[in-house]
Amino acid sequence: MAFEELLDKVGGFGPFQLWNVALLALPRVLLPMHFLLPIFLTAVPAHRCALPGAPANFSHQDAWLEAHLPREPDGRFSSCLRFTHSRALPNTTLWGLGQSPGEQLEGEPSTVPCPQGWEYDHSEFSSTIATEWDLVCEQKGLNRATSTFFFAGVLVGAVAFGYLSDRFGRRRLLLVAYVSALVLGLVSAASVSYTMFAITRTLTGTALAGFTIIVMPLELEWLDVGHRTVAGVLSSTFWTGGVMLLALVGYLIRDWRWLLLAVTLPCAPGILSLWWVPESARWLLTQGRVEDAHRYLLRCARLNGRPVGEDGLSREALSKVAAAERVVRRPSYVDLFRTPRLRHISLCCMVVWFGVNFSYYGLSLDVSGLGLNVYQTQLLFGAVELPSKLLVYLSVRHAGRRLTLAGTLLGTSLSLGFRLLVSSEMKSWSTALAVLGKGFSEAAFTTAYLFTSELYPTVLRQTGMGLTALVGRLGGSLAPLAALLDGVWLSLPKLAYGGIALLAACTALLLPETKQAQLPETIQDVERKSAPSSLQEEEMPMKQVQD
């Protein structure tokens, strides 16, 4: 008897599974709020060199700035430089206000970086880490690097949580992730220096990686084949809710410390909710924990209204399933490359996940230059994800996972490519293409999560998810730094995001299709297929169920 047959007895989709999805909704909402938080935490408002002694009369401000600040080629006052000596401006009324007339210098006046710090426009943000620690001009790289540090932490956490949850269980490691994220988030909000903030945010990313690695498999491993797609897409809408909620919370809370607290404190009720979250019965059986699996399966049958008693779900039957699925030795990342088909799957998934994350976060963190303020842009980027979910739901059921993933990545690449052809004056077209690209990239992200969870066997599912998430977060950590390439050529970041998305689209076509296939439970289930193109062709040992 395979686990799918046990699941058929107790109900593969019902109140038990819906309750499980609801309990695991909170981490799906919190993830985008933390991952996209740099949009607000690192925002750089308009700024200029601090000029002590500026006239109180606002009507003379322009003349005062003209005397002290150079202009950029576009005519704006410089944000990073001031004249070494104030210029003498003829016909100015500043002299009559008791201000020094400055010096009349021959040639081009010399400039210096702001020696007395900066003054910031606080009309949009009362405080960000950029204004708190002057992470502008020569220090702007440190401001961008905070996102890289965070995703580097997620990268490390993906490895750790993927491996440890396969060894010690999904539920236990989810508790570790919740507690760690809560404590580290609170410490981050209390940071007294940039160094302290960078370290604690990196560690917070490590903790939050547990959410990304554990939640989706913990949902899917309780679902039958026929409902995996709808449940996967449904649960991914919680991510979209988090994206839109972040726009609202960011609009209401303009101080970075309080904003960080607002997105961290919900971890507390999440910890309490774990009391009702069931451990994966699939995983329990692979570990030989028959009694625990029996208890959860009976609970599932009771909530789903299935008349399964002790005789209908005997411990002897479970012991046979456990004996067939028990892991002889602990899984390791080497196992993902030990056999031909798993090696093929792992290498392709690594490329795909790098491209998905690199393009998604490159698009998501670029909220400037669209003719909208940061809150409107964030809300619009969140709203477009809803129709993206519908696109995924319809496409994966008819076209399959592989073509859907490749198509959405191609759409992301084309949207970025067309933006390169649109001039900066065409704000409406630029906004439309940015929103379209964001929608395609979100659809690719949703499909990648569902697809990857179905490709790996139960005994290595968390390990495989951890590896691909590791490489994906590497892409996410490089995306903010790629934005610095605009100093070389303004269009270079978009070209990089689009090019990598195109490479990922081509690689996705090399993956096996999982539409209509039951979840593989052992490495042998994966390797038994000799054809590299599909998990649903001949010699499939697992029962096929119409999606």
Swiss-Prot record:
Its main location: membrane. The keyword Heme does not apply. GO terms for molecular function: alpha-ketoglutarate transmembrane transporter activity; organic anion transmembrane transporter activity; prostaglandin transmembrane transporter activity; sodium-independent organic anion transmembrane transporter activity; transmembrane transporter activity. It is a multi-pass membrane protein. Residues 521-547 are annotated as: Disordered. The chain crosses the membrane at residues 21-41, 145-165, 173-193, 203-223, 233-253, 258-278, 345-365, 374-396, 403-423, 431-451, 465-485, 492-512. InterPro entries: MFS (IPR011701), MFS_dom (IPR020846), MFS_trans_sf (IPR036259), Orgcat_transp/SVOP (IPR004749). GO terms for cellular component: apical plasma membrane; basal plasma membrane; basolateral plasma membrane; plasma membrane. It holds the Pfam family MFS_1. The keyword Cell membrane applies. Keywords: Cell membrane, Ion transport, Membrane, Transmembrane, Transmembrane helix, Transport. One of its GO terms (biological process) is alpha-ketoglutarate transport. It is found in: Basolateral cell membrane; Apical cell membrane; Cell membrane. It catalyses: orotate(out) + L-glutamate(in) = orotate(in) + L-glutamate(out); 3',5'-cyclic GMP(in) = 3',5'-cyclic GMP(out); GMP(in) = GMP(out); 2'-deoxyguanosine(in) = 2'-deoxyguanosine(out). PANTHER family: SOLUTE CARRIER FAMILY 22 MEMBER. Functions as a Na(+)-independent bidirectional multispecific transporter. Contributes to the renal and hepatic elimination of endogenous organic compounds from the systemic circulation into the urine and bile, respectively. Capable of transporting a wide range of purine and pyrimidine nucleobases, nucleosides and nucleotides, with cGMP, 2'deoxyguanosine and GMP being the preferred substrates. Belongs to the major facilitator (TC 2.A.1) superfamily. Organic cation transporter (TC 2.A.1.19) family. This is Solute carrier family 22 member 7. It comes from Sus scrofa.
